[in-house]
Amino acid sequence: MKSINPDPNGLSIGYFFPAGRTNHVWSDEAARRTPQMNRHNLMALAQAAEDAGFDSLFIADNWSGHQRAAERGGHQAPAFHAPLLAMGIFAVTDHIGVITTLHTTHHKPAHVARMGATLDAFSGGRWGWNAVTGHSGDEAALFGEPYVEHDKRYAMAAEFVDVVQQLWREEEPIEFVGKFYRAQGRIKAPRPVQQPRPLIVSAGASPAGTAFAADWCDALVTLARTEADVRAADERLQALVAPTGRTVTSWPFAICIVRDGEGEAQEEYEQLLKSLNADAAWEIASDILGSIETAKAMFDKLGRDEAVRAIGSGSAMLQLIGTPDQVAEQLISLRRNVGAGGVLINFPLWSPRELRNFGGVLRRLEEAGVRTSPASRNYSW
């Protein structure tokens, strides 16, 4: 058995793994410099992340939506299905965790319970679940289902996770009769290695999404542009967590470029932004602003051009752009001064070189005592 991270002072560093092509910087130059999406390149990237000392890989996923301009620009689509990609990664790594996105809206609880138990057992306790409800009407249409409104999706998700956890926990058949789901019996799958259950995270920062995370998850992934935004989001989360007695931490997204020389990382970033793909960025912006509550609150007051640049450049999230020392200082501050439990790192260029560059940051974090490498500990995450 393995337990979820018991270190209250540890900062979990995840890598936003590219299941599709370029992530969160909608630049034609970034797309041009992106390697082919094939087994060799993706497995090499996963191994480089493990060698650098990352705690986890985070694989986002969706079934449909905002694809046409994105595909023309070489951005994020087509994409590999997260749980299937994870199996390949587990086969070529030993320590790094993999968090896969699985929708509550488009699965049955038994599907996720069996997939999750299999992934966790196969990996030796290295699997985590990003539980999302889905936000796209295109996805509902793809499955031939009616579109479910926002708060109802989270009410359904709470019941869904309850059923999944019962199926993981109980050796005897369960009998569950809820408002949205019914389940009777047990799954034919190995027990999860992580106890009391695998890690669960979510990324919904609306009131309903935050309440869901407080009740059912271990971490809430947040979209924040500044340390003050991270602190405010965490305070809202902790106000809901406190009555439950649970521990739920905030994991903000960050866009990151690390270079050894002063100013080199910022220069690289500016070069990428010179070829910002406005069509692809606006398609993403329109979809996000129309359906994702977190982003609507952040960008509602922006005009088209400003929203396109903010979303297309990755400036909708924290920016960690600098030397290893500079980036490490920012991460240490997020842990010590803001209370972040983790950070999800997104590189606009995905290659083993970027991960090796970030390895220097991770070593500095260990020296500062804010994290422990997964290769040297006996617990997950």
Task: Please annotate each region the language model reported.
Residues D7, E50-D51, M87-D94, G116, ...:
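Acidic (Asp/Glu)-rich catalytic clusters
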Residues V25-H40, T101-A110, P196-A205, C256-R259, ...:
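Active-site mouth loops of central-metabolism enzymes
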Residues K108, A121, G137-D162, A189:
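Hydrophobic, small-residue-rich alpha-helical packing segments that form membrane-like cores
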